[in-house]
Structures are given as structure tokens and as C-alpha cells.
Amino acid sequence: MIMYATAVQTINSFVRLESLKEVYGLIWIFVPIFSLVLGIITGVLVIVWLEREISAGIQQRIGPEYAGPLGILQALADGTKLLFKENLRPSRGNTPLFSIGPSIAVISILLSYSVIPFSNHLVLADLNIGIFLWIAISSIAPIGLLMSGYGSNNKYSFLGGLRAAAQSISYEIPLTLCVLSISLLSNSLSTVDIVEAQSKYGFWGWNLWRQPIGFIIFLISSLAECERLPFDLPEAEEELIAGYQTEYSGIKFGLFYVASYLNLLISSLFVTVLYLGGWNISIPYISILELFQRDQIFGTTIGIFITLAKTYLFLFISIATRWTLPRLRMDQLLNLGWKFLLPISLGNLLLTTSFQLFSL
């Protein structure tokens, strides 16, 4: 009986250990995801505040100043206001499409953050096809916009959705060709491998210098994918009121608002990863890898800071562009994508392939 009781206690202890392992496993799954989502939300709030301050400076006026010190809580106040607004629905619209559209737009963009390396090995999912996963997922967002436009039963909304789909198709191809050129140089589709390939040669090893034409095309295509001026045709106020967002209010309108800034942030992060060396500081005699070997936490913190500093540099350029260039017409937008960017990006890919073949 004593041996039997001892065996039962041993089995129970093993069962408890296994259950604890499962609990800890679930915790370590949700903690990184929660941390990433919290960081993304904070980043979006910072972008909104920066855009308002930079826009105010360019227009020589005073920006937000009442909601918190220097107006840093203005975006949070606007989001809270949208949460408590009434959620209206068009009486003759397609309710399922109208309701699902904003969620598809936000979720598809959020999934793209899983392959972004914020520092050395600090990535949610280091996949062998990470860069193609981003391209595949980002092509889903325009479907949500088209569903929203069609489900609104409004001619302005429907035109905005059609414009969003046409614009996405026109600029997705040049952007993909630029990514293929980077993959050929790095011999990998993993975002971590692409950053490490640039880190081997320091500052001059950045793909910005090895692919200057691809960088310019990627920059233009990213702005078009984010529907930023001068490419904001799907929601042109003077022509379509608010485009596919015309019939939305409350939290659903807020989701579209958040999706646009999420898309801008993810595009800026991919510019940093693909062309600006990612977390690599690229200063002589200072190596992030050495910092990791000495103090992993300190090295990770420095890597995150460097990645975000490069990202917000591109964000500043996109915000300044908004108040610098006039909006294009729809025919000019499509001509730029199909007649100029597509042939140039294809030629750039062929040149990159030729150089890689001759270097073997």
C-alpha cells in the first residue's frame, strides 16, 4: 500500500509538472504577442502626434497643445471619442461586408509585424519566406477596402474601393520586383538574413547603396500602398468626400484610421530592414553583435532604438511629402505605376540577376 501511494504521488507530481509546462508555454506564446501589440499601438500614437506637430510646423501654425504636455495625448483623446460615438449602418447596404471590411484591413496589416526583426533575433516569427509573407498579407487589405466600399451602397464609397484595388495592383508588382532584387543580393527571403547580409560590410553594405534605383521605386510604391499624398486617390476629399470611409462612424471609422497608420509604420519598418541595415548601427569599431555577447539586454535595447530611429526618419519624409506634392490624377497614378515603375523595376531585377550570375 505504501509503494502504491508513493507511485500515485509521483504520477500526480508529473501531471502537475506537465500542466505547469503547458501553462508556461501558453504564457510565453501570449507575452511576446501582447508586447508586440502594445508596442505597435504606442508607435501609432507617436506617429499621429508627430504628423500633427510636423504638419503644424510646415504650415506655420500651432499644433495640438491642450491634451497633455505638448499635445501628446491628443491621439488618445480622439480614439476615446470615437469609441463612444454611435456606430451607424447604411439602411440599404450589405451589412456583413460593411462590418467585416475594417477588420480585414486591420488584421491583415497587424499580421505583417510578425516577421519584422526589431533587433538581433528579436522577431516574432523568423520564417524562410518572411518577406513574401508580408507581400502576400498586404495584398489582402485592399480586399477589405473594396468590401467596405461595395457594402456601403454609396457611389463615392464604391469608387473609393475600386480606386484602392486598382492602386494596390498597380504598385504591388514594382514593389515585389524590388524585394526580389534584395533577396537575390542576400540569397535569402528571411528578414533576419537580409539584415545580417547588410551588416557584413558596415555602412557601405546597406542595400541603399547597392540598390539605389530599387530604393527609390520601393519608396514610391510604399507611399502608394499606404495611400499617402500624393497617392491618396481612394479617399480624395475634394472628389469622393472620404472614399470608402464615407458611411463609417465610431469605432469602425477609427479602425480605418488606425489601419492607415499601421500600414505606414510597417512600410517604414520594411524600408529600414531591406535598405537601411535594420538594427545594425554601422559605426566603425562598434558592433551590435559584440554588445549582444557582452550584455544581451543592453544590446537588444540598442538594436530596437536604432531600428526605430531609422524608421521614424522615413516617417518624417512621408509626412513632409504630404504637404509638399500635389495629388495626382487617377490616369497619372496608373501611368506612373505601369509605364514607368514597372519597366524600371524589371530592368533593375534583370541587372541584379546578371551581376549575381557573373559574380559566381
Swiss-Prot record:
List GO BP terms, alphabetically: aerobic respiration; photosynthesis, light reaction
The keyword Chloroplast belongs to this UniProt entry's keyword annotation: yes
The membrane spanning regions, by residue number, are 27-47, 98-118, 129-149, 165-185, 203-223, 248-268, 269-289, 297-317, 340-360
- List the keywords (alphabetical): Chloroplast, Membrane, NAD, NADP, Plastid, Plastoquinone, Quinone, Thylakoid, Translocase, Transmembrane, Transmembrane helix
Q: Which reaction does it catalyse?
A: a plastoquinone + NADH + (n+1) H(+)(in) = a plastoquinol + NAD(+) + n H(+)(out); a plastoquinone + NADPH + (n+1) H(+)(in) = a plastoquinol + NADP(+) + n H(+)(out)
Give its localization: Plastid, Chloroplast thylakoid membrane
Q: Name one GO molecular function term.
A: NADH dehydrogenase activity
According to its UniProt record, the EC number is: 7.1.1.-
A Gene Ontology cellular-component term: chloroplast thylakoid membrane
Membrane topology category: Multi-pass membrane protein
Question: Which Pfam family is one of this chain's hits?
Answer: NADHdh
The domain of life is Eukaryota
- What's the subunit arrangement here? NDH is composed of at least 16 different subunits, 5 of which are encoded in the nucleus.
Give the protein's biological function: NDH shuttles electrons from NAD(P)H:plastoquinone, via FMN and iron-sulfur (Fe-S) centers, to quinones in the photosynthetic chain and possibly in a chloroplast respiratory chain. The immediate electron acceptor for the enzyme in this species is believed to be plastoquinone. Couples the redox reaction to proton translocation, and thus conserves the redox energy in a proton gradient.
Query: What name is this protein filed under?
Result: NAD(P)H-quinone oxidoreductase subunit 1, chloroplastic
Organism name: Crucihimalaya wallichii (Rock-cress)
